[in-house]
């Protein structure tokens, strides 16, 4: 399969997977126009849409795309049933698309019904995990988001994290505000900054690398624990996650 990204809005990415025959699945099409152009440019044949959650910048283009391609199956969680989803899916389900099985698992936190789609090595994680960060808690709790990230963290090292937003540089700035002397984060920040200066995307990233630069996946890391302990003593990793998320919200 071939992985493609379509920029949308200010910082969204609409992901598209296509096979050698040109059949494709579209992930979180927040608007239709750039998707329709890409379909025309590449001569793709849309087969399905994956929706991760109900926010408009992820579902806004679904109904228009269905007008052009009514044969498409639109998979999504229950919270997307009025956003164009034709097949509701949830935790533990598997869907066969383009000849590949995609496992679906619940990742509440950003929204209560948020889900991810995984077919090795591709993980479409919407607004749950970003490179260097994680989604804001609009509906769920810090504990729910922590548990969702821990699910993702069990996936293979070479998993490709296909997040829905270009937030990497800002997330790394936050990480360096907490661990300013972390050599790996500093090195990666320089690389990411060079990419963004050239208007190049920083995604997808592999999970092995993400475990090193994403503080939200490092809540049991001794350097991070020592830094948090300067302000407050938190015994549980989920409490340290909540502390980080609160800090990021006001960064």
From Swiss-Prot:
Zn(2+) 1 binds at residues 53, 55, 110, 127. It holds the Pfam family Lactamase_B. Keywords: Hydrolase, Metal-binding, Zinc. One of its GO terms (biological process) is methylglyoxal catabolic process to D-lactate via S-lactoyl-glutathione. Coiled coil: none annotated. Its cofactor is Zn(2+). Disulfide bonds: none annotated. Binds 2 Zn(2+) ions per subunit. Its EC number is 3.1.2.6. Monomer. Belongs to the metallo-beta-lactamase superfamily. Glyoxalase II family. Thiolesterase that catalyzes the hydrolysis of S-D-lactoyl-glutathione to form glutathione and D-lactic acid. This is Hydroxyacylglutathione hydrolase. It comes from Salmonella arizonae (strain ATCC BAA-731 / CDC346-86 / RSK2980). The lineage of its organism: Bacteria, Pseudomonadati, Pseudomonadota, Gammaproteobacteria, Enterobacterales.
